[in-house]
From Swiss-Prot:
One of its GO terms (molecular function) is lipid binding. Disulfide bonds join 3-50, 13-27, 28-73, 48-87. Pfam families: Tryp_alpha_amyl. This is Non-specific lipid-transfer protein P5. Plant non-specific lipid-transfer proteins transfer phospholipids as well as galactolipids across membranes. May play a role in wax or cutin deposition in the cell walls of expanding epidermal cells and certain secretory tissues. It comes from Vitis sp. (Grape). One of its GO terms (biological process) is lipid transport. Transmembrane segments: none annotated.
């Protein structure tokens, strides 16, 4: 799993995360694909770091929406998408 994979899966979510539109089906599909491809602890930590870095680098991201995204898509991930998340603690 690479940050490129994470970015590709979550690209359809960007406008939603900027509070600029409805939650697209393609975004939730990307969230689900990402969860399914993060099979190991190392993959989950990588995905976490990529998500946090991406969310910090995209201007105008609403972190409340980012944190709620997995739940809105019906996906459980073992960490919060937040700038303060310590990805090294993700199992």
């Amino acid at each position: 799993l690479s940050c490129g994979d994470v970015a590709t899966q979550l690209a359809p979510c960007i406008n939603y995360l900027r509070s600029a539109g409805p939650l697209p089906v393609a975004c939730c599909n990307g969230v689900k694909n990402l969860k399914n491809s993060a099979a190991t602890t190392q993959d989950r930590r990588t995905a976490c770091k990529c998500l946090i870095n991406a969310s910090k680098s995209i201007s105008g991201v609403n972190f409340g929406l980012a944190a709620g995204l997995p739940g809105k898509c019906g996906v459980n991930i073992p960490y919060k998408i937040s700038p303060s998340t310590n990805c090294d603690q993700v199992n």
